Amino acid sequence: MKESNSRREFLSQSGKMVTAAALFGTSVPLAHAAVAGTLNCEANNTMKITDPHYYLDNVLLETGFDYENGVAVQTRTARQTVEIQDGKIVALRENKLHPDATLPHYDAGGKLMLPTTRDMHIHLDKTFYGGPWRSLNRPAGTTIQDMIKLEQKMLPELQPYTQERAEKLIDLLQSKGTTIARSHCNIEPVSGLKNLQNLQAVLARRQAGFECEIVAFPQHGLLLSKSEPLMREAMQAGAHYVGGLDPTSVDGAMEKSLDTMFQIALDYDKGVDIHLHETTPAGVAAINYMVETVEKTPQLKGKLTISHAFALATLNEQQVDELANRMVVQQISIASTVPIGTLHMPLKQLHDKGVKVMTGTDSVIDHWSPYGLGDMLEKANLYAQLYIRPNEQNLSRSLFLATGDVLPLNEKGERVWPKAQDDASFVLVDASCSAEAVARISPRTATFHKGQLVWGSVAG
């Protein structure tokens, strides 16, 4: 693994500031009118397909691998027609075969179909994105407590723009192929429930083309900011997950903070998704305490996500294996931004052991970090650079991180996606195969969510 290690070392040196930030927190062709389809163009040049039942021709689909000496060296593909009805893929057909000649048909232009990508850790409710460029000077030695104080001053300035900028962020995500997300949303005394209400209003408007879970996030400390009553109100108001934050370094009482977080989840039958940045032994202790809590509480099985979990980078291989085995049994997941600084997260080791590993943007141009791109294909590319030897099969496998484990081909090179009755949620990519898409972060040309074209265009 010398190639991978040297690449990781290089990225580590060039990416230290990215991890420090994480510790705190194509042009599209104009649409053509289809003869049989009902189309119109939105102001942002996104074509709108209003037909509930149609054919999409000239779709490039992966069909298998070609092997040399037992190693995949090339991905086989074929152009096919995909029949879509009521948000589902109902059939894969020979290209341009239309059994029902009365149905509208569109043309994907030979672009590669890949599963929709998923941004499973983002903050849609607080961002500079969509407004004027802005970066903040954060001196060396700035602590998370300093950032909390800064945020308490800034949140009232950001709130008037919450809905407008959340809409812009969703546009950005869709342009990168993402239609499924999980957003953390500030719940603390400064914001109250305003951010939640604003985000829910945006998601209600965008629900036809964008699915998003909401984590009620006590950004200023669950205990420190005395946010438990607000968190309970957020659960009653429809938040899907109970959030948490650094129970030792912020709240100063690890067990009490985690017990409070879990109790809220149990009282309202919700999941848990906690920000855990701590890299001291307290971070390892918090992870072990959470795993033990889930082991003792069957109602929490499959309901815990640990975001960031930087403390895992301080464990040796055997310790990670032992913890991963317990996490698999309890269906505990990890959400990581794939940090590239001095901390080398054991993401591949966790994934290989069967732990569900997800990724996300985290911040997109805000007071925590200016670097977020909103591109899950870029995250898969970064994962590949850090963790694998770059061959055809390994590159194609790395796509799992972007798509929530949905891949066109299985390990044997057999097609497993798309198939009949799958959601018609996918992205068209200007690439010859998923390996190329990961390696080159290939341009996206159209994004579909449950049969609806939500970004980009196809031809008629």
UniProtKB/Swiss-Prot annotation:
**GO MF entry, a single one:** hydrolase activity, acting on carbon-nitrogen (but not peptide) bonds, in cyclic amidines
InterPro entries in the record, alphabetically?
Amidohydro_3, Metal-dep_hydrolase_composite, Metal_Hydrolase, Metallo-hydrolase_Enzymes, TAT_signal
Q: How is it modified after translation?
A: Exported by the Tat system. The position of the signal peptide cleavage has not been experimentally proven. Can also be exported by the Sec system.
- Signal peptide stretch: 1-33
Keywords from the named record = Signal
Q: Which NCBIfam families match?
A: PRK06846.1
* Family statement drawn from the similarity comment of this UniProt entry: Belongs to the metallo-dependent hydrolases superfamily.
Quote the protein name from its UniProt record.
Uncharacterized protein YahJ
Q: Which organism is it from?
A: Escherichia coli (strain K12)
Gene for this protein? yahJ
